[in-house]
Structures are given as structure tokens and as C-alpha cells.
């Protein structure tokens, strides 16, 4: 657990700039969570602006939750520059499988850019992996097959780290497979926890190997959720407590509470 806890320190020490082109539903939460985790956010999406911003960024997070053509144009410009600069690109394919527009957009980024991380729920990742999956809007769906095998296969195909979020988060880089069992059900009662996780994956990938970074990110947020749930009376009080718990998370707490399994 020590190597994962050290990634928390690296993020806080280096304060990486994480450029996020994300959805307007959770943009403020993603920015604040990035700060709470120890990184710095920039949320610019204009094609005229993103290229210069990427030159000083340490990671790029693309979230397709509220897509339109102008945003896609900005994402492409940012991803092209990120490719030139060699910084990690995280794709959160929100709602892939729910509509053709979302699915095709996600597949375009997967095929045209060297992604470091693809992070989504079971339905989204299953759709992109070409297995039978059900997706309801942007909510998690179901897949036919073993999530570990699906994550491993997709990661190997695209040479990246794949994260399937769920009761047990599954992470694979095509070689290793890990599971994270931290978290509480109330995390699913507020919008944006998945988007925030992608932002934090970006922060961790900026300072470490993407596989270890994603394991750290998912475990850290899960531990913080468990801590926040101890005092929360419901979703309304859980959310600020969650941000506080992320901010105050220590290495010792992480090492003690992380439930990480290495399957391969």
C-alpha cells in the first residue's frame, strides 16, 4: 500500500495542472475535487484557448457528459497538443452506449489519440469493448462477461489503463488487474462522483504510472467516501463532508483503510 500512498504525496508536492474539458453538470465539482486532492484545475474548452493551456498542463481529462460540436472541436485541439507534449490523456466516455453520438465520439478519441486512461462504468466500458451491455442514460448499466477480463482485454488492445467503476472498481493496464473495494452506496446518490474520479485519475497519472495512479485515485476517493458517510445524514450533508475527507486524507489513513486486491 505504501507505493500508492506515496502517489498521494507526489500529487500534493507537485501540484500538477490538470486541464479538464468536462460537462457543465459537474464542472465545478470536478474543479474543487482536483484542488482538494492536491492538484490544480483549469477548465477551459475553447479551441482558441486550449492549445496554449495544454502546453503548461500535466494531464488532460476529456469528459463527454454534455457533448456538442464546439466542445468536441476543443477536445480534439487539446488532445492533439497533449499528444505532442506527451502528457497523459484521460477519457471519461459518459453515456457511451446510450446514444450513437456519444459512442462514436468516444470511439473516435480511442482510435485517434494515445489515451493513458479510459474510465467509465460497466455499461460504458462494455459498449466500447464490444460486449453486450445495457446503459440507461449516464447511469451505470450491466455487461455480459467478467469485468476483469473485459478491462484487461480493452486495456491491452489500446495500450492504456482501463477503469471500470462499480461496487468493486476494476483497473487493468493489459498486464496487471486490480480491484478496489473502497466506497459506500451513498456516493451514487450525488451527481458527479464518477466525473470527479476521472479528474483525480488525471491528477495521479500526471505524477505516476497510470495503472498505479488510477488504483490510488479510486481507493482514495472510496476511503474518503467511507469517512464522510460516518457523519452524513443524507446526500446533502455527504457532499461537503466528502470534499473535506479528501482534503484531510493522510498516508496512514490510506494504508490502513485501502482495500486493494491484485488479481494478476
Curated annotation (Swiss-Prot):
Q: Which Gene3D superfamilies match?
A: 3.40.1190.20
Residue intervals passing through the bilayer: none
Q: Which InterPro entries match?
A: Hyethyz_kinase, Ribokinase-like
Could you tell me which species this protein originates from?
Answer: Methanocorpusculum labreanum (strain ATCC 43576 / DSM 4855 / Z)
Similarity section: Belongs to the Thz kinase family.
Any single biological process term in GO = thiamine biosynthetic process
Signal peptide (UniProt feature, chain positions):
none
Per the record, the gene is: thiM
- What is this protein for, i.e. what is its function? Catalyzes the phosphorylation of the hydroxyl group of 4-methyl-5-beta-hydroxyethylthiazole (THZ).
Its domain of life reads: Archaea
Q: Give an example GO molecular function.
A: magnesium ion binding
Name of this chain's protein:
Hydroxyethylthiazole kinase
Amino acid at each position: 500500500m505504501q507505493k500508492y500512498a506515496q502517489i498521494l504525496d507526489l500529487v500534493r508536492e507537485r501540484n500538477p495542472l490538470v486541464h479538464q474539458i468536462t460537462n457543465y453538470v459537474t464542472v465545478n465539482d470536478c474543479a474543487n475535487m482536483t484542488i482538494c486532492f492536491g492538484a490544480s484545475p483549469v477548465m477551459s474548452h475553447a479551441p482558441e484557448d486550449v492549445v496554449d493551456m495544454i502546453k503548461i498542463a500535466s494531464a488532460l481529462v476529456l469528459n463527454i457528459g454534455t457533448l456538442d460540436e464546439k466542445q468536441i472541436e476543443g477536445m480534439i485541439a487539446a488532445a492533439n497538443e497533449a499528444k505532442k507534449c506527451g502528457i497523459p490523456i484521460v477519457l471519461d466516455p459518459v453515456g457511451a452506449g446510450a446514444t450513437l453520438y456519444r459512442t462514436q465520439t468516444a470511439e473516435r478519441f480511442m482510435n485517434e489519440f494515445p489515451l493513458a486512461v479510459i474510465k467509465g462504468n460497466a455499461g460504458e466500458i462494455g459498449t466500447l469493448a464490444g460486449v453486450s451491455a445495457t446503459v440507461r442514460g449516464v447511469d451505470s448499466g450491466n455487461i455480459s462477461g467478467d469485468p476483469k477480463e473485459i478491462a484487461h482485454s480493452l486495456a491491452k488492445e489500446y495500450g492504456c489503463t482501463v477503469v471500470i467503476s462499480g461496487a468493486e472498481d476494476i483497473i487493468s493496464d493489459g498486464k496487471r488487474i486490480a480491484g478496489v473495494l473502497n466506497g459506500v452506496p451513498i456516493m451514487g446518490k450525488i451527481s458527479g462522483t464518477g466525473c470527479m474520479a476521472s479528474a483525480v485519475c488525471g491528477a495521479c497519472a500526471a505524477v505516476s504510472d497510470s495503472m498505479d495512479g488510477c488504483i490510488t485515485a479510486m481507493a482514495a476517493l472510496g476511503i474518503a467516501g467511507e469517512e464522510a458517510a460516518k457523519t452524513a445524514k443524507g446526500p446533502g450533508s455527504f457532499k461537503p463532508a466528502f470534499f473535506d475527507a479528501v482534503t484531510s486524507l493522510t498516508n496512514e489513513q490510506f494504508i490502513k483503510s485501502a482495500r486493494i486486491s491484485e488479481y494478476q
